[in-house]
Amino acid sequence: TMSEGATSGTTEMKKPEVTAIDYEVVKNDLDHVILLAPDFVYGYYNRGNVSSLLKDYRAALADYDKAIELSPDFAEAYFNRGLTHIFLGNNKQGIADLSKAGELGIVSAYNIIKRFTDTRE
């Protein structure tokens, strides 16, 4: 019936699935942003996030390092670098970064540290 078609049409309007190819396009755009503005901290931070989504964790760490070098109080960069380190098994570095993120105002970082250390004991 007509109402069924209308209903199924609305369910198809949900958020389109993002593919790895889309992330590669974004990463290429961010490469250009960084070339044009090498001191733009969010270029590195966002490219680090995209690299993480693409499972290129080493590249993500390098970009978070650069973002932190450019902006030493960039809490979100410490937070994401900490999570990446923990994911890669660099627990000590990860916890140190999460602790710094907590000091800089991301209170949820402390909850992650607590959960992580509770399960590791």
Q: Predicted regions span which residues?
A:
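Alpha-helical tetratricopeptide repeat
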Residues: T1-E121
